[in-house]
């Protein structure tokens, strides 16, 4: 864990109450579905709700050299995955996939980039039966992509697993304003059902607030939430460090819902 240096960009601080209010809105909730781990035991594995019936396709940008999630997803449920990554020439050896595109996701479609909306529409035109699944780890470009993607397109995804980067920017005025707008957009139609800090990077602390630099968020569309346990399991028994050679990074207390009084 590190503290923000006083002369850094983080010194232009968001009021702590503003950051705390957003973090509270992002607390994971019990979604009424058991969480299962899909993919590898470490990096490339994610916890998602066991609510896969009727999902037609997974979209997985930023696949890099690890398609454990997509391959395991197909073997478990028969859900095919569309892969994309401009940093590699093809999918990893042994990957099970529907298609691969050597492109990055961005806010425009051109030779090296494509919009999420364009990609989804090409493979799954409006009216095609079935929901979709998004597994996105695109090294910070998630913010531009989520701003650009219409809510009508995002609502086509039943489950979204998104790795958010540079979350310490919540401590800065501009960063908090930008991220709040993005999370507000997502929370209108989704709940957070799981959070898992990535132990590749440390946390940043300011007062009682502690923010993991990189964190995996699992979202479930609100219409799929079922009554269930009032509290999510934190940590979850299936959680595992992304880097097995480093200690697990626990979810800081400020990101955890307070258990109701007995």
State each model region's role.
Residues 2-57, 66, 101-102, 112-130, ...:
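Rossmann-like AdoMet/SAM-dependent catalytic core
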Residues 52-53, 73-77, 151-157, 186:
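Short, conserved loop/helix-junction motifs that constitute active-site signature segments
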Residues 64-76:
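Conserved SAM-binding loop of SAM-dependent methyltransferases across substrates and taxa
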Residues 65-66, 83-91:
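Short, polar loop motifs at secondary-structure junctions
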Residues 73-74, 89-98, 152:
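Short loop/helix-cap segments at secondary-structure boundaries that form the rim of catalytic
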Residues 79-80, 95-104:
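Active-site regions of enzymes building and remodeling cell-envelope glycoconjugates
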Residues 103-106, 137:
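Conserved acidic residues
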Residues 134-141:
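Switch II (G3) loop of P-loop NTPases
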